[in-house]
Amino acid sequence: MRLWTFSDDKKEFDRNKNLINGNLKTVLDDKKISEALIKNSVEKLAGNKRVYILSDHSDIRKQYSTALENLGKVRDLNGNIINGNTVLGSVILDESKQDITLSNITVFSNREKNFVTVKELKDYEDNKIEDDTRIAEIKAAIDDDNYINMRNTLEKHLQDQSTALKKKNPNISICHVHDRGEDSIEYLEFIKDTLGDDTVVRAKKSRNSTQYNINPTTKRKNYIKLIDSKFENKSEYHIDKLTLKGKLYQQVKVSIQWDKLILNNYDYSVVKITLFKRDGTTIYKEPMLLITTINVTSKVIAKEIYHTYLLRVKIEGVFKFLKDVLGWEEFQVRDWESIKNIIAICFFIGGYFYEIKSELTKNETIIMICDLAKSKGKITHYFFLEGMRALLTALRVDLFRKERNISDELYTKMQAYAGIGVEF
């Protein structure tokens, strides 16, 4: 999102910038946007018996930027460390698992002075940090109770949503869905004890099971990886056609196993899923492991846990829409407040387009706008925005012609430079 494209001149640019950089007493900031998103999701969804909160981190990559305030480190698509910042976003699905509502946004950087990793916090408590400046920064953040890290940011982000929904409807049931990286015991206990909610989270393949072998020499227990352990229950079912990352697989066999898992004296369920091609080879190198607070006692429930996790594709689709269509990573401001606020505003605007999704296929005007983008009959957020872009471009051209009093003859000559109307 480029502020300059919303401004006719530098004065208007400065006014727009002041609106989001914190210089005004009343400012549109990321916290206000977060509150508005949560309020909207509560009003819309609190009447449901059960909702699914899908949360994930998304890296805002600024590989070639160097002068941005609080420019942190993130990973590119190949896993390399590059410059950028981090966004934690959430969407909520209603009980039908169809309707998407963008529900919360948190923007932070691991270069902020008050960003203190869990390890760094422990080192501070154990007097292992030697940098006096950093010691002072951590102390100030702790004294002010405003230090942040990946763990407490996630906990606050989820608690704000869970508390708001239950305040409106104390009987609502909430299930949180997460990818790998959020399967720690601390996270599971936070969901179970503090929030009183359910969760389905993908487990890292490095996690140990409670099964073990005894080393005959040392007599020590060698715990078996969860992914390699034996599961008490097993079943399978078949899918005639399955499309994964654009590739079609036919006659797929799904092997699904489930068992109990005790972590820190708490009972959880774990589900292992393996997909087989019709020739008997696996589609993925490793099985998928899911940990859940839900008591899995049958194939039906195990299958439901798997399908619940697969809902994550919906938030991935939201992130892709924000980056590819709304230009989430294209901001051109440097101060941290403006960066946070523009990212949050973009998320909020994305929420609007998901709100009107049901209207896109019904409104004749919207259908025509999509056709303008050569949608070939497809009515989507992408083609709607591309059509709007074409309309706005045409409007700018018309206004320009009127302002400069450009004749049809001169306009035809201008078009010729763009190859319009030229025969080859």
Residue positions per predicted region:
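Conserved, well-structured functional cores that handle cations and Mg-NTP chemistry
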Residues: 1-303, 374-424
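Generic structural signal for hydrophobic core residues of well-folded globular domains
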Residues: 4-7, 94, 294, 309-312, ...
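Intrinsically disordered or highly flexible coil/loop and linker segments, enriched in small
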Residues: 9, 314-319, 331, 354-362, ...
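Short runs of predominantly hydrophobic/aromatic residues within well-ordered alpha helices
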Residues: 287, 302, 315, 341-345
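Short amphipathic alpha-helical "interface-anchor" segments enriched in bulky aromatics
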Residues: 304-332
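Basic, amphipathic alpha-helical segments enriched in Lys/Arg and hydrophobic/aromatic residues
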Residues: 332-358
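Conserved nucleotidyltransferase catalytic core and NTase-mimicking acidic/glycine-rich helix/loop elements
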Residues: 350-386
